[in-house]
From Swiss-Prot:
The gene is fabZ. The active site is at H58. GO terms for molecular function: (3R)-hydroxyacyl-[acyl-carrier-protein] dehydratase activity. The keyword Cytoplasm applies. It catalyses: a (3R)-hydroxyacyl-[ACP] = a (2E)-enoyl-[ACP] + H2O. Keywords: Cytoplasm, Lipid A biosynthesis, Lipid biosynthesis, Lipid metabolism, Lyase. This is 3-hydroxyacyl-[acyl-carrier-protein] dehydratase FabZ. It comes from the Bacteria.
Length: 154
């Protein structure tokens, strides 16, 4: 049964992620999506490396991934769900709200950030997602994010 379920789920390597999201280095924060279930959920991966530019100042002697970038990685994973299900047609996903953000422990270079996103609701082109970021199965951050999908150029 688990194999059947796994077969219905999609994935996205970095090239597919780059087709789904307009972000580019240094602000593309998702390396791949290991699981995407229609328009309801996804698991994104961010491999945290010391070579990322924010670590030069946050903090020089003890590099910690800024919480706002963890939330941005959550929003990008949610955006990939929206974009993938929109199909062709030139739409952009705008991050609208963040609620209930909690940061449980630092994320440091060498960590593999696993971002779990579940759609809570959708009304027209407005979406609400619950997001959890984990390292080695331990919850490091969580938030509820809102997004809006609009046609490009508006």
């Amino acid at each position: 049964m688990a194999d059947e379920t796994k077969a219905t789920l999609g994935t996205a390597d970095i090239l597919e992620v780059m087709k789904l999201l307009p972000h580019r280095y240094p602000f593309l924060l998702i390396d791949k999506i290991i699981e995407i279930d229609g328009d309801s959920s996804a698991i994104g991966i961010k491999n945290v490396t010391v070579n990322e530019p924010h670590f030069t100042g946050h903090f020089p002697d003890r590099p910690i991934m800024p919480g706002v970038l963890i939330v941005e990685a959550m929003a990008q994973t949610a955006g990939a769900i929206c974009a993938r299900n929109q199909g062709e047609g030139g739409h952009l996903v705008y991050f609208m709200t963040i609620d209930n953000a909690r940061f449980r422990r630092p994320v440091v270079p060498g960590d593999r950030l696993e971002i779990h996103v579940v759609k809570q609701r959708q009304r027209g082109n407005v979406f609400k997602f619950h997001c959890e970021a984990k390292v080695e199965g331990a919850l490091v951050a969580e938030a509820d994010v809102g997004a809006m999908m609009i046609p490009e150029g508006q």
